[in-house]
Amino acid sequence: MYYRTRTYIAGDWDHDKDAVEALHRWNESSKYGLSFSDAHELKQAKDTSLNCSIKRSLAERLDASKTFILIVGDHTKELKAGGCQYCGSYNSYRGTCSRGHTIDTRSYIDFECEKAIRDGLKIIVLYKSTFVNRDKCPEVIRWKGIHVPMEKWIGNTLYLDYDSVRNAIGQ
């Protein structure tokens, strides 16, 4: 059992990793006032080959979190990774797991969002864009929490908007 003191960051790690890394840079820098304890610093899944093992590990991290941040980019809504149907242990003919685990066809993102809502975490949705486009957000969390863009134009240059992110997180 953990105390709920951490911040859980979810997103498309293949396409939006730069936004996640920006949050970590702002958190680690003495120049910025962002301050959070990352839930992903807790233990990792022992068997990362099984989606159910990874989801168990994600659930433990969410159990230690008070804030859930979802970074929404161009591909977030379409992510499918994490569903049992993509695991080698899934028997599509029978719709069962050959290892005896419960079947969960949700993606990692949908799993994380649903658990954050169910657990009553503070929800912050950061759009890797200059505007909020809820159509890009997973449906389960589309109308929950605080939604803000995390980019802004200054002149002809696109920047990450630290102030917008900090205000959303409430620090």
Predicted regions and their residues:
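Amphipathic helical hotspot of TIR/SEFIR-family domains
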Residues: 79-134
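C-terminal interaction surface of TIR/SEFIR-family domains
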Residues: 4-6, 127-171
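Surface-exposed, flexible loop/turn segments at secondary-structure boundaries
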Residues: 15, 76, 131
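Short beta-strand/turn micro-motifs composed of small residues
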Residues: 11, 72, 125-127
